[in-house]
């Protein structure tokens, strides 16, 4: 496999992950953060970082919308639930191990 093919495969995997997260609106960002140490916001921020590394300017909201499939605020209104005290505690504990 050459570098171009590897990049194409990695891009396809990223698109599949984003599509999966768009369909799984039942999975809350806080639960992703607790379990995996990243969430939809992180993916949007990493997208923006990758663009900046290549001299491409993209705003935070635009980058996150590319992950959410809509403006983040709209997604939050439609799908985000209030975090439970248990989730908040688990999030705080997880922050100690995730970087």
Regions found by a protein language model. Name each.
Residues 1-99:
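Domain-level signature for proteins that mediate thiol-based redox and metal-cofactor handling
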């Amino acid at each position: 496999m050459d570098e171009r093919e590897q990049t194409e495969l990695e891009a396809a995997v990223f698109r599949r992950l984003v599509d999966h997260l768009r369909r799984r609106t039942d999975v809350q960002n806080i639960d992703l953060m607790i379990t995996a140490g990243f969430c939809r916001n992180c993916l949007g921020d990493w997208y923006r970082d990758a663009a900046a590394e290549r001299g491409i300017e993209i705003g935070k909201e635009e980058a996150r919308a590319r992950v959410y499939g809509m403006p983040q605020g709209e997604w939050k209104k439609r799908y985000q639930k209030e975090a439970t005290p248990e989730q908040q505690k688990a999030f705080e504990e997880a922050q100690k191990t995730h970087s």
